[in-house]
Amino acid sequence: MEGSLVQSAIAPTIYRRSGTARFRVRARATMMRTMPTRTLTLGGFQGLRQTNFLDSRSVIKRDFGSIVASQISRPRGLGSRGVVRAMFERFTEKAIKVIMLAQEEARRLGHNFVGTEQILLGLIGEGTGIAAKVLKSMGINLKDARVEVEKIIGRGSGFVAVEIPFTPRAKRVLELSLEEARQLGHNYIGSEHLLLGLLREGEGVAARVLESLGADPNNIRTQVIRMVGESTEAVGAGVGGGSSGQKMPTLEEYGTNLTKLAEEGKLDPVVGRQDQIERVTQILGRRTKNNPCLIGEPGVGKTAIAEGLAQRISNGDVPETIEGKKVITLDMGLLVAGTKYRGEFEERLKKLMEEIKQNDDIILFIDEVHTLIGAGAAEGAIDAANILKPALARGELQCIGATTLDEYRKHIEKDPALERRFQPVKVPEPTVDETIQILRGLRERYELHHKLRYTDDSLIAAAQLSYQYISDRFLPDKAIDLIDEAGSRVRLRHAQLPDEAKELDKELRQVTKDKNEAVRGQDFEKAGELRDREMELKAQITAIIDKSKEMVKAETESGEVGPLVTEADIQHIVSSWTGIPVEKVSSDESDRLLKMEETLHTRIIGQDEAVKAISRAIRRARVGLKNPNRPIASFIFSGPTGVGKSELAKALAAYYFGSEEAMIRLDMSEFMERHTVSKLIGSPPGYVGYTEGGQLTEAVRRRPYTVVLFDEIEKAHPDVFNMMLQILEDGRLTDSKGRTVDFKNTLLIMTSNVGSSVIEKGGRKIGFDLDYDEKDTSYNRIKSLVTEELKQYFRPEFLNRLDEMIVFRQLTKLEVKEIADIMLKEVFDRLKAKDIDLQVTEKFRDRVVDEGYNPSYGARPLRRAIMRLLEDSLAEKMLAGEVKEGDSAIVDVDSEGKVIVLNGGSGVPEPLAPALSV
């Protein structure tokens, strides 16, 4: 009883702490081992009860090893307990967890023992160890194993002592696991060794369970040995085979042999990069400091160069200096992982270096070599870089590093002692033509993976479109990603059910639903009929799918092309990534582009020159005739206030880009002071807002295909114009973090009131007045005068980069009347939402135009006139209850010029139909 209580209380505690304070647990167990167990004695009541957990908590301290050892050693006497305890001190956390899960399984089944079957269930239930992974890969899961165990041995009586002994066969398994660990050269016992011991035992319930689940013990053993890095032959000799340890256990645990992968054909082919591979080979042939460091932007193919070297070595296409060598890539994350105590990381690294020194044919490849700086460093410890420095300098360690330019500058250049040990090899971004060759080399691998074909045009389009439209990444990485995703898209599209199978599948779901309802309603005759129909539908669907598969197979075997990835698929992926339409122009879109002027004129009255210029620019860009290194177009709209400069930009955004919100609008009156200019590209380092990015650059990075409106450009600080020079000329701008933002797919519109005084005068000279009939001559004169004013205000290098300077005309009274119709229609639409039908008379419309027409102020006075004459009068009537929901109202002007609102009745002039947009 006493021992039972101690086990149930202490064993889980030891297990929980073993992960973080293993040394402390062992020390405590050693110290407490000799302390006696006392029984509670009371005067007159001797032997009333034994000590329970609460009585003995401060006295009894037992570790996991002593608890399990007591169960194993009990039949053999006390002599062997020290040996068994020593064995259990070698158990890893996962092995301890397996034993404890085995005890839990015994309790669950109501058994008073832990046998081989419970150990097997514990191995499966642990879930993360090598043993669990191997069993899972063999298709063995915990649920099925539990069912088989219950079939074979059944359930127990239900009463289980807290202290559960091991069966003799289970003890034998634990002893065999120790032998397996010794044969593998391991000084610990993990879950994999327990599984090998279980397989070595070969008899018992666990073996029967594995047999009934269809698992082959030899296959399981082979898989376990492969996963722990040992070949089958090394352990195949069994018990008498001796212990032939690994030659390079640390390297095989923390590294991957690229040369072996190249021999097995598991690496992608490396196309080009001959110069870089030759330079790496030259540096590796040096006597000292023979450590090349590949430096390049992310995605240009630095790792591929190391793989290319491994492929050359496996093919024998290398000079004798590195012939027969192995390229092993080191996983720094795995090397650091799990080093809880001081010195563990350094010990691993020193073992690694010793193994490399003993084997002259090892070339170490460290991807992201900057992770050496600071790796494993703690208070008072030295990092990996400083441990490796002496070996790197003396040539004892051949190492290829790879890192980006930024990381090299940030980490390695700061440490000159480390920098001099590495010889930099620059890896430039390949050109578009080189990228096309790389894609052709990789084509076969991606065709096999996606089970389709790539056309030559699709590969060329991937290289060209990724270079043109995806500006924040590098070739060939972005082009490879394009063909990969396009292949996935085409495969998914062809993997869908045929149309006839879809219809049958829909009917099948309905039949299944009806059958279940019939069963619930106990209408078994109907349920039987529906079941027959269900089976018939399933057979039909299977036949259709098999037929389509056979057709595809026949096409493939006959040499006919299966699913094809075309240029259109690549264009679709680029559009989905960037939001820039790069697909071929459809017939519907052609009509929209050709009728663009008409559509824009429904919102913009007059201003033909501006509308035509905008439409021409969009058409030019959409068919691909624009200069690829400049923005779509850049305009400056100059003219008096209220004539539609900003409205035209809004109309364009709403019509072509989807909504007015698709436009990036910057009010330049916010950038009047010098210190506010930095808001466009982001605050410099050390200032508030540095991490947030610029208002302009961040907006364009998120939406590269849009209209950018710089409203009231003349109000901005002159430094803004200096910043805009490179946007207008090269279509690019660098933000405060050094990232290049691409403006090549933006339409830049700047509005200005410069020259409005000249326009107001109508271009008249002293003593001359031009008639309205001569408006074209007048407009040309006004345009030249406004251009002169713009030249006086803006620098010539700024104006010279603009595509066009468009001068807006003043609005005539007729145009103001058309604008009034548009504004009145907006009011009608708002009232329709309130279920009120509104009409206005011709008199009222004339009154609005008379009050709202002012050539100097454009259409804005019209808005105020409608607000005062119509909205105010109507609001009063609605509040007074004279106009309610469901009513129709007519707005008119009486003989005195006052506005009157009438419920749609008689005695009023014939109303004007609601104003429609023209």
Curated annotation (Swiss-Prot):
- Span of domain Clp R: 88-230
UniProt GO cellular component terms: chloroplast
Which InterPro entries does UniProt cross-reference here?
AAA+_ATPase, ATPase_AAA_core, Clp_ATPase_C, Clp_N_dom_sf, Clp_R_dom, ClpA/B, ClpA/B_CS1, ClpA/B_CS2
A GO molecular function assigned to this protein is: ATP binding
Q: Show the segment(s) annotated as I.
A: 251-498
Cited Pfam families: AAA (PF00004), AAA_2 (PF07724), AAA_lid_9 (PF17871), Clp_N (PF02861), ClpB_D2-small (PF10431)
Q: Which UniProt keywords apply?
A: ATP-binding, Chaperone, Chloroplast, Nucleotide-binding, Plastid, Repeat, Transit peptide
Major localization class:
plastid
Tissue expression profile of the protein: Widely expressed.
Instruction: Provide the residue span(s) of the region labelled II.
Output: 565-756
UniProt entry tagged with the keyword Chloroplast? yes
Coiled-coil ranges per UniProt: none
Q: Please give the superkingdom of this protein's source.
A: Eukaryota
Q: Where does ATP bind?
A: 296-303, 639-646
Q: Which PROSITE patterns match?
A: CLP_R, CLPAB_1, CLPAB_2, UVR
* Region Repeat 1, residue ranges: 91-156
**Record's subcellular location:** Plastid, Chloroplast
Q: Where is this region: Repeat 2?
A: 166-230
Domain UVR, chain residue ranges per copy: 505-540
Purpose: Molecular chaperone that may interact with a ClpP-like protease involved in degradation of denatured proteins in the chloroplast.
Family per record: Belongs to the ClpA/ClpB family. ClpC subfamily.
Q: Per its record, how is this protein called by name? A: Chaperone protein ClpC1, chloroplastic
